[in-house]
């Protein structure tokens, strides 16, 4: 009997130890891109310091664009990430079980339609029939839709060339496409290194919000971690807004950019992450409706169905100055 009790006690102890190790080894997996506040947060390490108090590690994974990042969320390789406005719309249309968590203020100058410096294209009207490179389903996809609508050009009257940023730049450099719709830092690099000319940025066409998203299961199981991430993003954004030169010096080597190009990127960003408001959700609904009308997504969407509602305690904390 004593042996049985001892064996049971040992089993309980081992289970307790295993549970403790599992908790100690818990990891939140975050996807980021070569743009935005997350790259500064990663460089400063403040999120790691905060979550370490709860035995949580942070694992960072870089993605070339929003569609690729959201695919990572969809297949479960990351828990949380940041994209522009359009990728979540395409992901929702494809059935991905993701939720909008927070957003940054608009940054319309940090995406643009670029043409080669000697291009005969002088206005949006000249885009008719042209080959235009873009990352399909990325934030700039909506910019292109809006720009064409402004010029009265049906989407079917251009030749979209869907390429990720690195391949799109190569095509742009060798003259295989007539224009390139792209975001920072690729935009700034093309402006400074290739002397690309800006046909238009998103001013008056698209807000270019950055959105923070999570898998629905992660947000449900770990609301405090989600809140901590958003809080740290907000804090580092406030710091970055007040110290743009320091941020540029910090991220320039991470982005493999000259300092003056990094400064251009930093100054065009929006800072100040907040949980999703009804107004921002309504703007996303307009984007979803536009893509549905063009049949670029297979069905109409309801954005509010995929907006995360944070616990009251997190909303109260976020409202404090």
Sequence positions of predicted segments:
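Bacterial N-terminal signal peptides that target proteins for export
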Residues: 1-10
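Pocket-lining segment of extracytoplasmic ligand-binding domains
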Residues: 86, 160-253
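Small-molecule pocket liners
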Residues: 37-38, 107-113, 196-197, 208-212, ...
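Short, glycine-/small- and polar/acidic-enriched structural segments
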Residues: 26-153, 161-162, 178-182, 204-206
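Sec/Tat signal peptide C-region and signal peptidase I cleavage site
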Residues: 20-24
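Conserved C-terminal helix/tail region of periplasmic/extracytoplasmic solute-binding proteins
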Residues: 289-321
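Bacterial N-terminal signal peptides
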Residues: 9-18
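Secondary-structure end/capping motifs
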Residues: 220-298
